[in-house]
Amino acid sequence: MRPADAKENRGQPRSRFGSGALGLLAFFVSFFLYVWLRIEPGVLLHATGTLFFFSDPFWKTFSSRPGGVLDYVAAFLAQSDHFNWLGALVLTAVCFLIFLISRRLVTFAGGVVPWTVLVLPSLVLLLGLNQYQTLAWNMPLGLLLSLAAALGWFLVPGK
């Protein structure tokens, strides 16, 4: 919305659901419920067969290859899938962080985008989870790491 339009619409009521915190809250609550009750993270854990151990040999299998640390963290977070509600909660939190970092990056770039556009990566991740053949934790964590690196670049002083 342009500033001139904002002045014209000042006295008119706005839709509560389509904009602001209420719509965003409804989206992430729906996201959580869909992952918890429809996708069932326990089935994802069973389908991928992800194991995790706090041992040095297990860590060395990950640390010796590119992207291994991300896979290690993904294997750790996949253990939350033993409880459907906990796996859904952690995945929703990761997607919410993706939303927050995306919003911050858009403001650094000088733009204003509605929240409905900023949740599109979460929807794409949700579509991928419906297949039960994906690396369920690697995709959101990889996206989160990439966005965090871009945000870090913007925050570096004197660039």
Q: Which sequence ranges carry the predicted segments?
A:
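Membrane-interfacial loop-to-transmembrane alpha-helix junctions, especially the N-terminal start
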Residues: 19-25, 56-59, 106-118, 158-159
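Membrane-interface micro-motifs in multi-pass membrane enzymes
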Residues: 63-67, 114-159
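Eukaryotic intrinsically disordered, low-complexity segments enriched for acidic and Ser/Thr/Pro residues
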Residues: 82-83, 95-99, 120-123
